[in-house]
Amino acid sequence: MGIYHPIHMIILGFETSCDETAVSLVEDGRNILSNVIASQVELHARYGGIVPEVASRQHLLEIVPTIQSAFSLAGLDWDDVDAIAVTKGPGLAGSLLVGVNVAKSLAFSRHLPLIGVNHLEGHIFANWLEGRDPGAESGFPMICLITSGGHTDLVLMESIGKYVLLGRTRDDAAGEAFDKAARILGLGFPGGPLIQKASEGAVGTEILPRAWLKGTDDFSFSGIKTALLNKAKDRGFYPPKDDNGPDSTTVREMASAFQDSVSEVMAVKTVNAARKHKVRAIMLGGGVAANSKLREVLGNISPVPLYIPSPILCTDNGAMIGAAAYFQTGNGARDSWDMDIYPNLRLS
C-alpha cells in the first residue's frame, strides 16, 4: 500500500552532514521545487580527501546564498513554507552543527515546525522524489542498500519509519574504498566518479577477488583494496614515484576490476537478502548508488522492481531531507528547540 498523507506541505530541507551545502524546497514529499547544492569537491580534492574543519567553515560561507538561491529558483517566499527539516546525523559534527543551528534559528524566528532527519533515511526517501511512490507501486517490505563514502548498510524497510539493519560494512564503506583505490591508481579525489570514468573501454584483463562473507549480510571491502594495492606494488607504481606511474591501459583495467568486484558483491548480497526476506522491491540510496556499474548489475539480476534515484539525488541533497521529513510528519514528527546533533546516528 502507499503512504496516506492528506496534508499539503512545502518543506525547506537542509543537508550539511559532510561536504555539500544543500538546500531544497519540496512539495508534498515528492515534487522538487528547487534543489541547490554548493559542492566542496574541488576544495577538498587538493587534500586528497575531506577535511572536517575546512568543510564546516565552507558551510558557514555557503549556507545563506544557498538558501537564497533555493527560494529564487522555486519562485517562493517564506509565507509559502510550512516546515523546516534538517539532517541531525550521522555526519561530521562541525558540518552538522552549521545546518542544525541555521535551521533552528529560521524555524524559531518564522514560527515554523522543526523536523530533524536521519541522513540515512533521507537517502531512502530520495526514491520518492521525481513524482514516484515505491510504496504505492510495489508495497512493503523492501530491501534498501544505502552505500556512500561513510556507510554501506543493508536495511529491511518493513514500513515507513520501521527499519531492521541486516548488514553493514565491517571495515571500509564502499565509497571510502573507491577513494582509496583511486589514490592507489593516481586518479585523485573523489574516487567513485574517477574510477567509473577510468574504467570506460576496459576489456577485463584484470580480476580482483570478491569478499562474500558467506552466512552474513555484512560487507567487507578492505581485502579488495589490499589486492589492488598488492598488484600496484608488484608492478612498481606504488608507492608513487615522479617518473613511475602506471600506463593508461593498466589504470583502465585495474579500475574496472575494482569497480566490478565492489559492484558485484553489493548487488548479489542485496538480491540474496531480497529473496530471503521475500520483499516486494529493492531500493538504492547514497553516493555510490550513482555508479553506473552497480546500477547495471542490479538491474540485470534483481528479481523484484528496482528503485534508484537519479544520480544527482543519490549524492547528498536537501530534497531527500525534505521528502523524509514530509512522511515523518504523518506520524506527528516535530522536534524541540533543544534538538542536538548525532554524528554517529544509526537507522535501526
Language-model segments: residues:
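Glycine-rich phosphate-binding loop plus the immediately following alpha-helix
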Residues: 158-201, 225-226, 230-233
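N-terminal beta-alpha supersecondary unit
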Residues: 9-80, 86-90, 119, 123
